Amino acid sequence: MKNILPPFIEIYRALIATPSISATEESLDQSNASLITLLAGWFSDLGFNVEVQPVPGTRNKFNMLASTGHGAGGLLLTGHTDTVPFDDGRWTRDPFTLTEHDNKLYGLGTADMKGFFAFILDALRDVDVTKLKKPLYILATADEETSMAGARYFSETTALRPDCAIIGEPTSLQPIRAHKGHISNVVRVLGQSGHSSDPARGVNAIELMHDAIGHIMQLRDSLKARYHYEAFTVPYPTLNLGHIHGGDASNRICACCELHMDIRPLPGMTLNDLNGLLNDALAPVSERWPGRLTVAELHPPIPGYECPPDHQLVEVVEKLLGTKTDVVNYCTEAPFMQTLCPTLVLGPGSINQAHQPDEYLETRFIKPTRELITQVVHHFCWH
């Protein structure tokens, strides 16, 4: 099997050269079909059964599941195929040309995270996958950078229940067993326009929003006081007011005001509970001004996530790497994979390179990442 696949660096080069940008703006958004075709071909060459799954509600996006072995359990290695858009003016290199310089591999997706599939393929090139005693699954998802539609759809529709999963996001090979969630909402207040010379003839949406913000700040303080998870650097749920806009002229009563806010819940906090707390906080404003205040999602919410600290996956990975698992504040697809099986986030490259111009992965990660993948496959699929 050694000669079936291109060399590691050529696999990496081909992945980076295949654009797969996800963006909410349609003009920037791209299908990942070409990248999925590449991956499907390579995993087929290694003897995997490959299924390509269209993801509903997306602009021609696909998941790919490569599987081998029979029976229950096994290991799932997973990652996303898409990247964020890039600012051409801030890149000093071609984002779609893999460039090696100063012990770094430069290119869009080198760290976050198309390169992870090159590591998987390279680690498996000399493995006879037909002889594995438990199943091995490779999942490539769509739209992680926007809606996480691929991971959501896969977790909702699959019957697979592996023993455990590893998501190869860039963690500098530091295993992550928990992270916060993310909820982003828009609060809209509808007033009544009028001339500013007679305020009583209108309803000023900015004034109503001022009242609403006061109640939201009380909720922020309540969340901070009620919920704690000491392992996080910020050990409580955060609430941020990120954007506000209202009105169109200084001499007009504001007819509409819109506030964008987010909450980052701790693991174990349900999205329904948080939505209930927000609605309860804003209830006094809604009761005083019926029909004038609404709350809606800006993006599909992401729950917090935690892998049980005493699970075998945590024990095995900590032993292999000689380091303890950690927790982080950013989000991944882990909450959706965790509904299927215990999941860790663990991969090469630094999260500090994610979404940055001149993104790179340090070559020092190449050898230990290959070894780690080989070891976890051996442990969970051969034993």
Swiss-Prot record:
GO terms for molecular function: acetylornithine deacetylase activity; zinc ion binding. Disulfide bonds: none annotated. One of its GO terms (cellular component) is cytoplasm. Its EC number is 3.5.1.16. The active site is at 82, 144. Binds 2 Zn(2+) or Co(2+) ions per subunit. Keywords: Amino-acid biosynthesis, Arginine biosynthesis, Cobalt, Cytoplasm, Hydrolase, Metal-binding, Zinc. Zn(2+) 1 binds at residues 80, 112, 169. GO terms for biological process: L-arginine biosynthetic process. Its cofactor is Zn(2+); Co(2+); glutathione. Pathway: Amino-acid biosynthesis; L-arginine biosynthesis; L-ornithine from N(2)-acetyl-L-ornithine (linear): step 1/1. NCBIfam families: AcOrn-deacetyl, PRK05111.1. Homodimer. This is Acetylornithine deacetylase. It comes from Salmonella agona (strain SL483).
